Amino acid sequence: MKLLIQGNNITVTEAIHDYVEEKVERAVKHFQNLTTKVDVHLSVARNARITNKHKAEVTVYANGTVIRAQEGSENLYASIDLVADKIARQLRKYKERIQDKQHGNVKTSEIVEDKPVEENLIGDRAPELPSEVLRMKYFAMPPMAIEDALEQLQLVDHDFYMFRNKDTDEINVIYIRNHGGYGVIQPHQAS
């Protein structure tokens, strides 16, 4: 397993490096056969108004799957402890899902409820968008089923996940609904 530790607004000392290495290796030790690479990003916010100044983010690459967790606190070592525990839980869930898949599949209709979408989602409000693009990301988007995209959404610890639907070969977005459950956004031809 390859471990990369980086710091933003912080010098990664030997003591910090050793602590991160110990915690991350302990978190992923039962999943060595799945894990190929682990990226750790440590950062300190210089803004006095931010309460959780020390942030630790761990990204694990496991058999083509990305598993991500981040935690913040007032203490860097506490953030490292929290994120190590969180990534260990996520890896355990990932391994259990792999084992469950070997014993039977779940249908898409059981995961995502099919509901009609309102035509005007924002009503009379004006969309609040940033005036300029701050950052662009590029990543491979292999075709996958909605079930696999849902699994990825849960593993990356975001509110949404964009993917290429293997059934339609179109870009879809699966997201966490505010009132619970998940939703899928699919392109629709304008008539």
UniProtKB/Swiss-Prot annotation:
Keywords: Cytoplasm, Translation regulation. It is found in: Cytoplasm. InterPro entries: HPF/YfiA_ribosome-assoc, HPF_long/plastid, RHF-like, RHF/RaiA, Ribosom_S30AE_C, Ribosom_S30AE_C_sf. Its main location: cytoplasm. Pfam families: Ribosom_S30AE_C, Ribosomal_S30AE. GO terms for molecular function: ribosomal small subunit binding. One of its GO terms (cellular component) is cytosolic small ribosomal subunit. Interacts with 100S ribosomes. PANTHER family: 30S RIBOSOMAL PROTEIN. Required for dimerization of active 70S ribosomes into 100S ribosomes in stationary phase; 100S ribosomes are translationally inactive and sometimes present during exponential growth. NCBIfam families: yfiA (TIGR00741). This is Ribosome hibernation promotion factor. It comes from Synechocystis sp. (strain ATCC 27184 / PCC 6803 / Kazusa). The lineage of its organism: Bacteria, Bacillati, Cyanobacteriota, Cyanophyceae, Synechococcales. The gene is hpf.
